[in-house]
């Protein structure tokens, strides 16, 4: 009887300290289900991930200049089945107002940080919600300056796009 009670008690305590199964960590590998848009992906586990600290032009609802191209690039970088690791940015919230996990997405095969790569090629701009700059803030800002100077991606396709990392990217209405 005592042994049974001890096992039940230990099992109950383990449940209190074990991490929740739905909380992705950078040590766990996940598989991409599909790309929803340029800065949002869905995992086969059912989790929705918003790429943290970046913003891409909108594709749906109010389509913006370069939105489709940014989304297509993310789809090429993260085709269905791609193995990724997710890293939380301590400077930001863990989840956005839509219930998406805010994470850096890193491909397992080559270590490519997709958030950084999208900014590097001009498909995204830094977005520091509430002014909270994370671990890659300086790198993202430097890559944006370079992409703008070289007219890469949205910076070449959408002339006059303002750059304000505290407000996100707004390329304006999609031009025909």
Segments (PLM) and residue ranges:
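Small beta-barrel nucleic-acid-binding modules, primarily SNase/OB-fold domains
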Residues: 2-8, 13-176
